[in-house]
Regions:
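Conserved CoA-thioester-binding segment of acyl-CoA-metabolizing enzymes
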Residues: 2-73, 107-111
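Amphipathic alpha-helical segments at domain termini/boundaries
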Residues: 6-37, 136, 177, 184-215
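Short, histidine-centered active-site or binding-site loop motifs used for metal coordination
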Residues: 36-40, 93, 155
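Hydrophobic/aromatic residues within transmembrane alpha-helices
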Residues: 72-73, 85, 135, 194
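Glycine- (often His-adjacent) and acidic-residue-rich active-site loop
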Residues: 74-108, 127, 157-160
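Glycine-rich beta-to-alpha active-site loop
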Residues: 75, 106, 111-158, 162
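Hydrophobic/aromatic ligand-binding patch that stacks against planar heteroaromatic rings
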Residues: 111, 134, 169-170, 181, ...
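Hydrophobic, secondary-structure "cap" segments at the distal end of domains
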Residues: 167-177
Length: 215
């Protein structure tokens, strides 16, 4: 990370911090940073606890006239968002529960996609399943050209399909043929390939990811 960005982080004002989920909102010079750093876990996963926190953060960003845009970043060293909490999925015992879970994710990401202020997904590491669905709902996606950065919808390997809008947003982003290949195989897409196919807008070195995303 560059020295300039280190100074920016030190002078950021923390507006909100949820200790239970590890999600925080800070702002510097009109740019908000939404950081996800799930406690006691090597990766960030998505569960029913994070949705209400993201909703609060979206509302705060919408209402704060000093904020012009937002970055979505991970506090994990080599992982962005690794998808749904598998243990929570295993506790779903009925079609109605599964539908409610899916609809909740759809509503959250529809709101993210409709935000009047741009959200930039600053991706370093794995953006998998629901993590990629979140990235697709952001207006821009910037990723690091690094071996740890992979994007995929691996749910199919568990007998599932993306339930939070990924099956609609991915074809609009990369085209139907490429989207079907990802959705039906669950294959990992490396950073360079993701850029070539239009899945991300820009590739950068990890040390300047936040600088570029904040511009």
């Amino acid at each position: 990370m560059s020295d300039s960005r280190m100074r920016d982080l030190r002078t950021s004002v923390v507006l909100m911090e949820d200790a239970a989920t590890g999600i925080s909102l800070s702002v510097h010079d009109g740019v908000a940073t939404v950081r996800y750093d799930q406690p006691h876990s090597p990766v960030n996963t998505l569960n029913t606890r994070v949705g209400p926190v993201f909703e609060q953060i979206f509302s705060r960003i919408e209402q704060d006239t000093s904020i012009v845009g937002a970055l979505l970043v991970s506090g994990k060293p080599d992982s962005w968002i690794a998808g749904a909490d598998i243990d929570e999925l295993r506790r779903v015992t009925s079609p109605m529960e599964g539908e409610a879970l899916s609809r909740g994710g759809q509503q959250l990401l529809n709101r993210l996609a409709a935000m009047p202020k741009p959200f930039i997904a600053a991706i370093h590491g794995a953006a998998l399943g629901g993590g990629l669905e979140i990235a697709l709902a952001c207006r821009y996606r910037i990723a690091t050209n690094h071996s740890k950065t992979v994007l995929a919808l691996p749910e199919v390997q568990l007998g599932l399909l993306s339930g939070a809008g990924g099956t609609q947003r991915l074809p609009r982003t990369v085209g139907l043929r490429a989207a079907l290949d990802m959705i039906l195989t669950g294959k990992n897409i490396r950073a360079k390939k993701a850029w070539q196919m239009g899945l991300v807008h820009e590739l950068v070195h990890p040390s300047i990811l936040l600088d570029v995303a904040a511009q």
